Amino acid sequence: MNSSFSLVFHSLLYATPATLVVALITWRIGVRFHKHDVVDTMWGLAFIAAAYASALATQGHGDSTRRLLLLLFVTIWGLRLSTYLALRNHGLPQDPRYTAMLSPAQGSEDWYALRIIYLLQTVSLLFIGLPINFGLVSQGKIGLVGGVGIILFFVGFSFESIGDWQMRRFKSHPENKGKVMDQGLWRYTRHPNYFGDFTLWWGLFLISAEHGSGIWALPAPIFMSWLLIKKTGKPMLENQLQQTRPGYRDYILKTSGFFPWPPKR
């Protein structure tokens, strides 16, 4: 166990600067275009950078199949998410949620953004990614628990991807401007993308925690779940949508807030 913890710590020594480089580059882009919601695009790419830096730091350790799966899963999730968000946000004004976050800034808004948005998200990201660090050095073969984790990852990835695709298609029709999306997966949960993120990260945790000391990374998916359900995900978005989307309050009354469930009649 002590060996696992020392390897995880060693991997973080590589993952931290790799993630900071991505954050600083993204911050410079945000400064250049006066648009700090670009940090959303950083999220997936920074996880990829952290995962590969950690893998580099722990070469020769851990089960090779688990290492390969974790890197593959983080890569396809991160690339899809960052690509989708970059395309979605291109040409749009800054997300009002980030404008509100930056409103207390005294002096340079850009330096305030670096501290409050980019560096804070970097710390959160490194913490949320701890299951990956533990999983990369786990020696045991993938068994039943890991298999359940793989299934959860694909269920979550499918929910997130399909939900985003359905929303993008809905918004592509001019006649839907200002309307509430309540079709497809959005009929069963107000946030299929957040539910997907929640599910796939619990899946990654199970893959990583099946053997050895990976169970110590349990606070990471709990923290991620709290962010999505109680803090920066669902609550902030719904507060904004209730003010900007007529009919969203009715949508809330009939549609499950997070976990998929048939709508109320």
Question: What role is predicted for each listed range?
Answer:
Residues 33-49, 93-116, 179-186:
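Juxtamembrane helix-capping/reentrant segments at transmembrane boundaries
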Residues 32-33, 105, 245, 255:
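A broad structural signal for alpha-helix termini and local helix breaks/kinks
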Residues 9-23, 46-81, 85, 120, ...:
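Hydrophobic transmembrane alpha-helices
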Residues 24-35, 83-88:
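C-terminal ends of transmembrane helices
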Residues 1-9:
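Short, strongly hydrophobic alpha-helical membrane anchors
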Residues 81-134:
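Hydrophobic alpha-helical segments and helix pairs
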Residues 32-38, 58-63:
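Helix-loop junctions on the outward
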